[in-house]
Amino acid sequence: MFPYKIVEDVVILMPNKELNIENAHLFKKWVFDEFLNKGYNKILLVLSDVESIDSFSLGVIVNILKSVSSVGGFFALVSPNERVERVLSITNLDRIVKIYDTISEALEEVQGR
């Protein structure tokens, strides 16, 4: 569905192009079916290749965050580009979700838990 890799027990999601109303529902279903419902509770969402993101997708991110948090897991965003970072800031999502500059920085944090 979407590019990803698993490092130890951490799922690293790497969508590209756009996260929007056209694919956000599919993305959410895929994340739940393939990872959350199978017991993975450490998720990194890499946004470096995401060119744009809309409010529907932000809702999906919040939904994933809540689900991961409810089971004591870890969820973070990694390396959003300037445009996406601006959207995260305007919506104050950057105050709710941890954001890391690099995958290695985020992995270091999550694996140290």
Swiss-Prot record:
Phosphoserine occurs at which residues? 55
Tell me if Phosphoprotein is a UniProt keyword of this record. yes
List the InterPro entries hit by this protein, alphabetically: Anti-sigma_ant (IPR003658), STAS_dom (IPR002645), STAS_dom_sf (IPR036513)
- What are the protein's UniProt keywords? Phosphoprotein
Q: Which domain of life is it from?
A: Bacteria
User: What are the residue boundaries of the STAS domain, all occurrences included?
Assistant: 1-110
Q: Tell me where the signal peptide lies.
A: none
What is the recorded post-translational modification?
Phosphorylated on a serine residue.
Instruction: Read off the PROSITE patterns from this record.
Output: STAS
Q: Which Pfam families match?
A: STAS
Record-level Gene Ontology MF annotations: anti-sigma factor antagonist activity
Q: Which family does it belong to?
A: Belongs to the anti-sigma-factor antagonist family.
**Function statement:** In the phosphorylated form it could act as an anti-anti-sigma factor that counteracts an anti-sigma factor and thus releases a sigma factor from inhibition.
Q: State the name under which the record lists this protein.
A: Putative anti-sigma factor antagonist TM1081 homolog
User: What's the source species' lineage?
Assistant: Bacteria, Thermotogati, Thermotogota, Thermotogae, Thermotogales
